[in-house]
């Protein structure tokens, strides 16, 4: 898993959507519905180091949930961040035999409540627990 791979996933997900720049980090401040919190610009972040730290986690399921959460919160791209995070995390989930992360449609509102809390606090403890209890599908 690399930042370049994540960029390729973004390109594929958004290539027919009119989003620019495709497969490249956004360079403008973005707003997020439901919160006044604003992510740092990618130029202010070290995504390589952040990803490396996540990938060092020896607990496979926790690593995948961290990847999912981080990918959504980092707001690397103008659009498609949660979709990219979901696909990237699920690639690792499947590779490691951990099932997939799938937010049940009837729990989307609850998910967004936890997500906004995570965005605003940068503490993923609550959302990770909630994802583990509600969104992991296919564990043997």
What are these regions (language model features)?
Residues 1-140:
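FIC/Doc superfamily catalytic core
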């Amino acid at each position: 898993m690399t930042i370049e791979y994540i960029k390729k996933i973004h390109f594929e997900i958004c290539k027919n959507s009119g989003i620019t720049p495709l497969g490249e980090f956004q360079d403008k401040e973005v707003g997020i519905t439901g919160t006044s919190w604003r992510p740092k610009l990618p130029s202010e972040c070290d995504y390589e180091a952040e990803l490396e730290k996540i990938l060092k986690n020896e607990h496979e399921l926790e690593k995948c949930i961290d990847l999912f959460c981080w990918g959504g919160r980092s707001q690397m791209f103008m659009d498609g961040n949660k979709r990219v995070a979901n696909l990237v995390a699920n690639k690792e989930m499947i590779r490691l035999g951990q099932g997939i992360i799938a937010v049940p449609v009837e729990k989307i509102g609850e998910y967004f409540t936890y997500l906004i809390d995570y965005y605003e606090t940068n503490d993923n403890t609550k959302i990770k627990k909630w994802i583990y209890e509600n969104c992991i599908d296919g564990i043997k």
